[in-house]
Amino acid sequence: APRHLVVAGPRTGIAVVAAQFEAAGASRLVHLAVQTPSHTPLLSQAALAFKKRLSVLPERRLSFPVLSAIDATAARTASSALDALARQISTPLNWASCLQTVREMQPDAVLEIGPGNALARLFSELAPEIPVRATDDFRSCEGIVRWLEAGNR
């Protein structure tokens, strides 16, 4: 989050940026094995197509806020949440702000849904007092339910 940064683009551009970070004293650089230029303008056409696909869904007030990973803004209607979801495809994300907003919401626990556990690890650094896990930490849905029922410890 605050100490982590992801840079995306063509390999030649990444090499130039990596050299600049090393010269500036970066302590660690990791090349992610990702083939899709997610969260970059290179996917702007995909974002537009996705937004069009989502536009058929009904408008309604949400029963819980949905945070935009772009700027940690809380969407409270379906249309604003779906708009943010589509924009996230081609816009850089600000996980640090998003995780800070989650912390400020004072949840009883946080469960990262999706592949991996990178965000759960980042959140545990930011808010060690809040129990956090990722779905990938569990072998089954029943394990997740047991964790939640046990008070998240």
Model-identified regions with their sequence ranges:
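Acyl-group transfer acyltransferase/transacylase scaffold of fatty acid/polyketide systems
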Residues: 1-153
